[in-house]
Amino acid sequence: MGNSLGCVGLGERLAAAAKDGDAAEAQRLLAANPGLARCTTFGNLNSPLHVAAAKGHHEIAALLLENGADVNARNIYGQTPLMQACRFGHWEVVQTLLVFRCNVWRVENLSGRTALHMAAAGGHVKCVRLLVADAAGDRDGYVNKAANGGVTALHLAALHGHVECVHLLIDERASLAAQTLPCAAPPMASIGAGSTPLHYAACGGEVKCCQILVSRGADRTAINCNGWLPIDAARIWGCNWLEHVLSPKSHLPIPKFPPSGYLSQPLPSLIAIAREQGLNLSSEVSDGFDEGADACAVCLERPCTVAAEGCDHELCVKCAMDLCSVIKSYDSAGIAGEIPCPLCRTGIASFRTTAAPPPPSLAGSPARRSRRNNSGGGGGEHEASNSGGSEKGYGSIDPDAGAVVPLYYAPPFAPSAILT
C-alpha cells in the first residue's frame, strides 16, 4: 500500500505513458525517479509493466525492466505481465520478458492458468512458440500443466478452434488423453468431467482441429463422465458436420499432417544468448558499435552478435529472435523445426555467439570485404529475409560498397489491444 501511495501523480503519469506508448515521457520520468518502475495503481494493482505488456509496447517494457521493474509482478488477480502479453498476443513483449527471465510457470489466482493457457485460448501461436522454447528444460511438464478443472492448454486451443496452436502443442508432446476434472468452470463444466481434448474440439466445431487430433492418435471411443463420446459432444453442441471425422465407425480417410511449421529448434539457444547480450532495442545503436563490426544484413542498424550453426551467416540477436519467432520452419533432412536462413535458406537448428570483430585497421581488408560479399549470397523467399539475390523485393549487392543493400524489409506486425 505504501508503494501505491508513493506513486500518486508521477506513477500515474508513468502508467499513462506506458498505456499510450510514449517512450520519451516514460524515459524522462524514470530518469528522474527510477523507483517509479516498481509502482502499482490503486484497485487492480497493475504496474506500469502490466500496462505496457497489455498494450504491446515492448520498448517501454524493456525500459521499465532496465529501471528495476519486477518482471514477475502480480496484480490483484495474480496475473503477471507475461500473462497480459500472452492474453493479447503481443509476442515482442513476450520476447522481452523472457530475456529478463520471467517465470513462465506462474499461475493466475482464480483459474490456475499459466501464460501458455492464455496464449492457447487466444490462438496466439507465436506466443505459444516462445513460451514452450523457454520451458525446454521440462517441456512435457509445462505443456501438459493443468489449470483448475484439469484443463490443459491443448483443451483450450481445441475448444476455441485454433488449428495452429493445436498442431504446435501436439508436436510439443501435449497429451491427447488428458482428462478434465469435475470442478471445471463454465462453459467447460457443461462438457463434462473426464473429457479429452477431442471432446473439446468436438464442441468447438473446427474440422481441422479434430482431424489433427485423430490423425495423431486421439481416441474417438473415449467416454467422459456424462457418458459422451466425442461424436455425442459434437451432436449436443450442434456440430453435426463433424460426424464423418469423429464417428468410430467412419471409414473416410483422415489426412496426414506434417510437423507444425511453428516448431522452432533455434529459439532455446537464442533466448540463452539474448539473456547474456540483451536485445539492443534502441534504434540509435547503429552509431554506437565498433567500426570493425559488421552491421546486421537484415536491419542494418545493430552489430552482428550471433551466427547460425552450419552456414555461419551472422545477424544481430534481435533480428535472429524475430526470425525464429515469426518465420515458419520446414523439414530439412528429416529434422523438423529448422528455420531457413534469410540469406541462404539453409536450415538453422541453433545459433552461437560470434567471435570478437577484427580491429578497425582490418576493416577494409580484402578478406573482410570477401566475407561481407559472401554473407549476402543465396537468395531468399520469406517475408523477413534480405538475401543477396537479384530478385526485386529481397535485396541486391552493391558492387561498389560490397555490402547487402535491402530493397524491402517489412518487420512483423504485432496487433495492438485495448486494456479493459
Curated annotation (Swiss-Prot):
ANK repeat boundaries on the chain: 44-73, 77-106, 111-140, 149-178, 193-222
Disulfide bonds: none
Annotated region (Disordered), positions in chain: 355-397
Zinc finger (RING-type): 296-345
UniProt-listed PROSITE patterns: ANK_REP_REGION, ANK_REPEAT, ZF_RING_1, ZF_RING_2
InterPro entries xrefs: Ankyrin-SOCS_Box (IPR050663), Ankyrin_rpt (IPR002110), Ankyrin_rpt-contain_sf (IPR036770), RING_XB3-like (IPR056760), Znf_RING (IPR001841), Znf_RING/FYVE/PHD (IPR013083), Znf_RING_CS (IPR017907)
Entry keyword set: ANK repeat, Metal-binding, Repeat, Transferase, Ubl conjugation pathway, Zinc, Zinc-finger
GO biological process terms on file: protein ubiquitination
Pfam families tied to this protein: Ank (PF00023), Ank_2 (PF12796), RING_XB3-XBAT31 (PF24921)
Lineage: superkingdom: Eukaryota
EC number(s) reported in the record: 2.3.2.27
Name of the coding gene: XBOS36
Protein known as: Probable E3 ubiquitin-protein ligase XBOS36
Catalytic reactions on record: S-ubiquitinyl-[E2 ubiquitin-conjugating enzyme]-L-cysteine + [acceptor protein]-L-lysine = [E2 ubiquitin-conjugating enzyme]-L-cysteine + N(6)-ubiquitinyl-[acceptor protein]-L-lysine
Gene Ontology MF annotations: transferase activity; zinc ion binding
Pathway connected to this protein: Protein modification; protein ubiquitination
